[in-house]
Design a protein with these regions (language model features):
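C-terminal substrate-binding/catalytic lobe of Rossmann-fold NAD(P)-dependent oxidoreductases
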Residues: 1-11, 24, 89-192
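Rossmann-fold NAD(P)-binding glycine/threonine-rich loop
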Residues: 24-31, 35-36, 43-66, 72-84
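N-terminal Rossmann-like NAD(P) cofactor-binding module of classical short-chain dehydrogenase/reductase
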Residues: 17-18
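Short, surface-exposed loop/turn motifs that are enriched in glycine and acidic residues
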Residues: 66-74, 101-108
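Short glycine/serine/threonine-biased micro-segments
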Residues: 41-44, 71, 108, 138
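Glycine/charged-rich beta-loop-alpha catalytic/anionic-binding loops adjacent to active sites
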Residues: 59-67, 148-155
């Protein structure tokens, strides 16, 4: 069965933890996972630098799948970015436009920041701008625009509903079972 809890009871047998809570709760849950040597998928966003550093440090002890977005479509978008180095350069302008529901707390979203970091890892020094909009009940939309000389390329990922995140999280949790310590991403799942 599946148990949903803010704390992990000491007597509960746990194979893997999936966390989509808040940065503070995620760090508490991560500490419990580390203490009990349980793999964890962290889907929470909005972490501070010191929290990200702690996640990185604890990944030396336990397997951590850090996934600000668990959808397959964003994994595809990141893969396209990774394979675009023959077409683009740091001289191009990259623009990310995102739309999320009005209740979303972090802005820009973890997904937008993840896309930005992906671009900068391929094109160090590139100019990457982000516009964030929060309105209505939109589960998430990210549009990447790449400006060339007198032309623009746009790639859009639109979540039709939130079930895609649950499906990706389940896939990630199953994949994480049996993995050794390390900091993993959704890219690792789709490349294995």
């Amino acid at each position: 069965g599946i148990t949903i809890s803010e704390k992990i009871p000491d007597d509960l047998k746990v194979d893997v933890i999936v966390d989509f809570s808040s940065p503070k709760n995620a760090m508490d849950i991560l500490e419990s996972a580390n203490k009990r040597e349980i793999p964890i998928l962290i889907g929470t966003t909005g972490f501070l630098e010191d929290q990200l550093s702690k996640i990185n440090t604890l990944s030396k002890n336990i397997p951590i799948l850090f996934a600000p977005n668990t959808s397959q479509g964003i994994a595809v978008l990141k893969s396209l970015i990774n394979s675009s180095d023959q077409f683009f350069s740091a001289d191009n302008h990259f623009h990310i436009e995102e739309i999320h529901h009005s209740e979303k707390k972090d802005s820009p979203s973890g997904t937008a920041l993840e896309l930005k970091n992906e671009i900068l890892s391929i094109f160090p020094g590139a100019k990457v701008s982000i516009d964030s909009l929060r309105e209505g009940i939109n589960p998430g939309e990210h549009k990447l625009s790449i400006s060339l000389d007198n032309e623009t390329i746009e790639l859009t990922h639109r979540a039709e509903n939130r079930s895609i995140f649950a499906k990706g999280a389940l896939k990630g949790a199953v994949w994480l079972l049996g993995k050794g310590p390390g900091l993993y991403s959704m890219k690792d799942i789709y490349s294995s």
